[in-house]
Each structure stands twice: as C-alpha cells, then as structure tokens.
Amino acid sequence: VTTFSILDVEIQEIEGAKTLFGDSLTTFPMAMVILDPYTLESSWILDTADRILSHFQGADVRVALVVAGSDPEGAASFLGPLPDRILTFVDRERKLVKELAVKSLPSFAVVRQDGSVLGVAEGWDPAEWRELADNLAEMTSWSRPEVPASDDPAAYQGTPARGSVSQVIPTDAELVEKVIIRFAGDSGDGMQLTGDRFTNASALAGNDLATLPEFPAEIRAPAGTLAGVSAFQVQISDHDITTPGDAPAVLVAMNPAALKSDLGLLVNGGTVIVNEDTFEERNLEKAGYSHNPLEEGSELDGYRVIKVPMTELTKEVCKDLGVKPRDADRSKNFFALGLVSWMYSRPVEPTLDWIDEKFQGKDLVIAANRAAFQAGHAFGETAELGDQRVAIKAAPLPSGTYTSITGNTALSWGLIAASHLSTRPLFLGTYPITPASDILHELVRHKRHGVMTFQAEDEIAAIGSALGAAYGGYLGVTTTSGPGVALKSETLGLAVSLELPLIVVDVQRGGPSTGLPTKTEASDLLLAMYGRHGEAPLPIVSASTPSDCFDVAIEAARIALTHRTPVILLTDGYLANSSEPWLLPDPSTLPQIHVEFATEFNQTNEDGDGVFWPYMRDENLARDWALPGTPDLMHRIGGIEKEDGTGNISYDPENHGYMVDLRQERVQKVKVPDLEVDGSQDYELLVVGWGSTWGAIKGAVGRACKDGYKVGHVHLRHLNPFPNNLGELLSKAKKVIVPEMNLGQLSKIIRAEYLVDAKSVTKVKGVPFTAAELDLVLRETLDD
C-alpha cells in the first residue's frame, strides 16, 4: 500500500462548487473511474464505468466519476446523463491525477478514507480492473461485478494522463523557428516507430508539425539494400506549417543504403548522423558503394557528419541487463531517438512512459529500450557536439485539446461521428488493401460506438455487403485503393441505379495495376468521375490534410444520406499515413444529419387504396427510403431501369432518357459552399488545387505573395458537383495553373467545363509536391 498526499487536492463538483478531495471521502473509501473527455479511449469505457460503479452503489463505498482536464460544462457534455445517477467531480488541472501518479486514462482507482490507495488500474486492462473490483468487493463484503462483460471493448493502453508536456528550453540550446529531420534505415530498423515517437514528443511539447512516412512495399526487403530503405520525415515548428518540409536539415542514416538513397534530399550544409557500425564491406556493397564514404570520397563534402557507433554502444549498455546481443541490436533505434531528442531539446518523459506502456510485461525489452534511449541522450550531452543543440518553442496554436492524428484515423473517427450525427449505425464492408487497411484496423475497435465491420473475401463482396447494409438502413461504407475501385465499379453502378446512400473511400496510390502500393499519387479522379458503364454520375469529395479527413467523412455521409446516392471520398497514401496536430472539435458544434424513412403509403392506386412507390422524390430528388420489413411498404429495387415513381421495370425510351437526366440533376442539387480565395484577392494567377496538394500550394502561394506576386489559391473539396462560383473565379484570372499528382486530370475537366486555358503542373513520382517546387512554378508563370 502506498500513501499519496491527495487529501488536500482541490477538485470541483459537476455543479461547479470547489471542494477538497479528502472531504469527499467521508467515512467510506472512494471508488473512481477517471476519464479524459477529449479522447475516444475514455469514451469507449463509459458504459463499462457506469456498470461497475452502479454495481457498488449501496455498498459501504462512495463511487464517483472524475473528469480530468475539463471544466464542469465540458464534463457534463461528455458524460451525458451519467452525473444524474453517479457522483461526478472535475479535476480541471489534473492535480488529483498527478497525486495518484496515474500515467494513462481511463483509470480505475480505489482510495481509502485516510488517503491510502487500495489500487489503480490504468488504461483498459480487463484483468486489472477485475482484480481491483474483486478486492473492493471483498473489502466491502459486496458481490463482485462482471468484468469484463460481453459488450465491453477489447483491452487497450489508454492515453497520457497528464495532457501536454511543458517544454524546458535548455540554456545551451540555440532557439530556431523550425527544423526538418529525416530518419532512414532498413525496414526492420524501426524508423517509423522512431519518427512517430519523436513526433509525439514534439506534439506534447506544443509544436506544430507535419510528417511524411515512406516505406517499401515489401514486408521485409533484403536487409541493407536500397529497396528496403524505410524513412520518416518530420518538420516541427514554432509557427503554423502545412508540409513536412522542402528538404531535411538532418538525416539520421542507420546504414549505408539509407545514406545512399536519402543523402541527395538533404540541404547543403546539413547534418548527417550515421550508425558507423553498419558501414562494413558487405553492407557497402549492397548499397552500391565501392568505398566507405565515411573514410574516403567526396559524397559527404559540405555536410556536418556525426559518426556514432550506435550498435556497439547499445549492446554495451544492455550487456549488464541480461539482454542478448542480437536482441540489444533491435534497440539501436532508441539510441538514435535519444540522441536526436537531446539535440532538439525534446521532453524525454513521453518516450520513457510510452516504452513502459507499450512493452508492459516484457521487462527485458523495456529495460533495453530505456537503456538505449537514455544512452543516446547521454551521448549527446557528453560527445561535445558543439553548437548542435537547438530548441523550438511551442507554436501559438488556438486554445483547446490537441492530438496528433493520421488521415486514416481521422477518417475513421469522422465516419463514427457521422454515424452518431445521423443516428444510423455504421457498417464497414472491406477487403484489406494498402494504404486503406488502417481504416479497418481503427474501426474494428469501435464496436461499442455502433460500428460493425466485415472483412470480405474480395473487393466485390466488400462493396456488395456495404450496399446491402445501406438497403437495411445502415450508413454503408467500403474502403479501398485504385485497383479495388476498378473491381467495385459494377456494384457502384448498381448503387447509382438503386439510389441508396453508400460511401466508397479511395485511398489513392501509384498505379497502374499493383503499381506503387506504399507510395502516394492522386490519379483516380477520372476513374471516380467516369469509371462506370452508362451514365452513372455520383458526388465526389476529397480531403486536403490528415485532420480534414474527419470533416470530409462527415460531409460524404451528409451527401449520401441526404441525397440517397453513393459518394466517392478521395484521399491518398500521403494523407493516410502522415500526421499533424488536430484540435479536437466540440461534438455539440457538429451539425446533425437528418434522415427520414418512409413509414406510410405515399400514393393512391386507381382503386383508392394506399400504395408505396419507392421512387417518389423530395425537393432534392432523393427517393423515399423504406427499411425492409416496414409494414405495408414492401417494394422492389434492382439494376434494371425503373419507372420513376412506381419503381416498376421499364424499357420505355422516354422514361430512360428522363431517368438519366434525373440522376444527373440529383447530383447537381448537392449543396456545395462557395470557394474562398486564399492569398491575393486581386490575383493575376489563380492556383486551383485538390486533395493533398493543399499544404504545398498554400506554402508556395504565401511565399510568392510575400514577395509581391499577385497569386490566389482555391482548393476544391467538392469535385462533383463543382462549387457554383468556380467559373466566376476562373474568369477573373489572367492565368490559371492546376498542380496535381497525376498527368492533369482536374485540368482536363476544368478546360472542358469552363473553356479556360488551365496549365497543368504535374508530379507522379510517388512523393508529394514541395512548397519550393511550386513556388518556382508560380514565379516562372507570372514572369513569363
């Protein structure tokens, strides 16, 4: 039993009154579930917390919910009706969390009357929660609750309990505005993990950031080869940024192949940190070197080179821990992370806490990773690296709670939000395909939020199941990438004919065929627009940033449900895997999506009897949606052309022409907000973008405008139909350019639709545009 000084911690009641925690104990111990209202991890456990705490009401124990990091109003909004039946406190400044030494939320804690702690279960570990609940039941002579219950979520680790980490600026560090770092090594060297943890520490320190993960398509390419290089680039800044940077200032190269493949990306005069232990003859040959560039040759001329024996130093610090040399070798990425964390004054606590949580139960792994990280940090302190230590202040971001989020995760959460906003349960029918699979991995965790997931045997079965779910009243979704869209095209045409709400998420990648599974591209626009036989129009929306995927998912659902139509949502591999800070929205500000089902007859037959016609329409031309099993509303739908209104099969030429026009008009009735111009309002050059080009375009336009160029920028979220004012904005420009990660697909559509001489700027290399590339294009276009 450990005693904490928690009796004098000030907390708030849900009504707003302040009190001391000790006063709330009275003569009984306190059983608490502590929650963070700004994380899904805490929301997942609400029903479980309600069940466990309610079970102990009536026993000789007080039960309470504690909401950390929020005010009473926010806590009440998060908890809904729970405070009406369970005592609720607010730990706004997380002082109680700190005194309890809680590292992750949600947590289940029991505190005795004297302030001593019976136990704390952190995260959602059903076994730990059950053990603590059993101990409480034994102490109070009460029955034991069911933990876990059948509808409880699967185990998960929770989120950091302390919120953001205060960044300490070392006195010996030079303040800089931003830095771009690239970690590169074998696909088995843990570069994605290393970059992710550096990103996480930077997010907690309050920096703005943008990332670019790059990895090979092979599960494990031959070690030491150029084909097997995995890289992670991150830009961190003390101000708003929109891209992972033009060129890294620091390259961490874990082997010769990483140096060979990525050195050309580094800025002139940049810093190269190499694991010199890997620069031996065999690895040099695999990378295509005829010599050791660390000892001879001119490849590294003009760069600051820091040679570190990472492998040997890692093995040395792990030797006394009982870790085998081969196992210690796996921790060398943490040595690199520790060194770079020292160089850029990153807080160390988030990484050490994460190691403890991630590898819980694997004591040797924890010990090795912690030792390697701390050794790397110590190496930076003692190696006399001169002026290499810098610091970046926190960015002045709008107030609120932030999380670092990837596009696939944001899209998943947006679909869940849309499900709740529309009161329609979410069904995902999908077949795994890179880079869309993470959406399935995320949604499968959210059963308690009304999410149903189905992994089909192929792409056609996946979309068929989603369309069937839509027929049954669900928000039907299927996810895929380019090859999968081609396979789904016939069923997508069926969805157009059936006029049912369906969302098809296309996370684009390099093509054609298998193409570049792990590299980004945006070459499916024409496929989305026209890739079905017959006249089969449908709305198309696209996301511009990782966090924008959340909003676009809700918008796709709004269009699909309101207009009874399939919708294609376009993202790409860059958005899917890159991350940025995201200000968590207030759920109460998200607009509801109103869905009405047909429940009664909507027509009268010639005998005066009520009948249901499935193709009767509202002002949006959306047909009536009757759920299967609704009394007296039995009806027939299918892929053969239907008569408008009755839904009867029709081969009449006039009816077919009418239905073709009607389906097109129905898409045009989608309400699309007007475009707003970024940059110069009296522009001579207008840049029209879509998708993930937003960040690079915004950065380039900002640079050009700063130097006096009259450049405007509009970015299309809605690609079909277009915003009403697009034509007007195009007509005001002397010149128009359209940057795309394809060979000019949007440019072709704009030229055909508006008869504008739109110049296409293309890049199809598997990597996104940089702001520097586009800045040069803007200046050349206006100077021409």
Regions found by a protein language model. Name each.
Residues G245, L251, L300-Y303, K307-T314, ...:
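Conserved thiamine diphosphate
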Residues I34-T48:
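Conserved redox-active cysteine motifs that mediate thiol-disulfide chemistry
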Residues V1-P29, W44, S54, G58-V67, ...:
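Non-globular targeting/processing and membrane-anchoring segments
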Residues L397, S404-G414, S422, V552, ...:
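Flexible, low-complexity linker and terminal segments
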Residues I169-S422:
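Active-site cofactor/cluster-binding pocket
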Residues P106-E122:
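A short, hydrophobic beta-strand/beta-hairpin element that forms part of a small beta-sheet core
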